[in-house]
From Swiss-Prot:
Source organism per UniProt: Staphylothermus marinus (strain ATCC 43588 / DSM 3639 / JCM 9404 / F1)
Pathway: Amine and polyamine biosynthesis; agmatine biosynthesis; agmatine from L-arginine: step 1/1
Function: Specifically catalyzes the decarboxylation of L-arginine to agmatine. Has no S-adenosylmethionine decarboxylase (AdoMetDC) activity.
Active site positions, chain numbering: 72, 77, 92
Catalytic activity reported: L-arginine + H(+) = agmatine + CO2
Modified how: Is synthesized initially as an inactive proenzyme. Formation of the active enzyme involves a self-maturation process in which the active site pyruvoyl group is generated from an internal serine residue via an autocatalytic post-translational modification. Two non-identical subunits are generated from the proenzyme in this reaction, and the pyruvate is formed at the N-terminus of the alpha chain, which is derived from the carboxyl end of the proenzyme.
Designated name of the protein: Arginine decarboxylase proenzyme
Amino acid sequence: MDNTLIDPRIIGKHVYGNLYEIPEEIAGDEEYLRNVVVEAAKLANMTLLEVKSWKLGGEKGGVSVIALVLESHIAIHTWINYRYATVDVYTCGEKSDPWRAFNYIVEKLKPKEYTVNYADRTQLLKQ
């Protein structure tokens, strides 16, 4: 069997993580979080198509913001009482930088600590 180098046809980059001990006033501020996502998309050279957000009440209440970008998506989900957030940035193509978006979001949400994961989701086709 020939193991010739494979050709990446789709460049998929996925950066995601968990943010701990974020300020409650940030975790619950839907407008602020929307603005953070919009700016993160710009900084990462993404083409913003639409932003949706909503605030959920109750003990596990929080805010969700999802940006659809031409290259894929950015999502933030917060839990106010737990001072916790998850962040997901996925891009397709070579021109966008999901790391830049993720790092900007972390800077603006001000966690005391966070974890970050990366998955290369490039489709590799044998030649």
